[in-house]
Every structure is written in structure tokens, then in C-alpha cells.
Amino acid sequence: MSRELFEKIDTTIRRERLYAELDLMREDVMKRFGIGRHHLNDLLNSYADGLSFPQYINSIRLERARDLMISCPELTIADVARRVGFTAPNLREQFKRMYGVTPQEFKAKQ
């Protein structure tokens, strides 16, 4: 049941693009799925490599940003950031931390 619940949460966040909301809060997800903080944390620990909620959402945002830069090279970095729920400076910082290059460097190699 727990894995199914995590997959339902993950699918909803991705399909409905909840990750793109700048003000998305853990409480929004908890309320929507009728679970408490501890239960959500347990799900993330078990099925999202132990990531915290902000880390989990950022990982989805970064994955989507990378996909957008590949599939829509005409988009500016600011456009990509807006579409995935980051500010441009935050996308730059988080992207570099995860992938070892800036979004601009990544785009230049595509």
C-alpha cells in the first residue's frame, strides 16, 4: 500500500505539474492525500532515496528542466526556470549542484 501511495503522489505531482508551483508546500501534498508529515517523510525515505520533500521536488524540477533544454532548445534559461518552478538564479545553482555544469553550459553542449 505504501509504495502504491507514493507512486500515486509522484504521478500526481508530475502529471498535474504541481512541482512547477513556486509556493508548493509539503502541507499541500499532505492535505491532498490525507496523510501526515511523518507518513509523507516515511514514504520519501522509502521510495525517493531518502530525500526530504524540498529535495524531492527539486529533483523533479531539475529532471524536467534538463528534458526541456533538450526538447525545446529555443527556450531561454529564464523560460525553463519559470516552467519548472524555479527562479533563474535558483535553477542555475541547483542545476550546477546536481549535474556539475550550469544550465547555459548544458544547453551549449546540446
Where are these predicted regions, by residue range?
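The alpha-helix within a helix-turn-helix
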Residues: 30, 41, 80-81
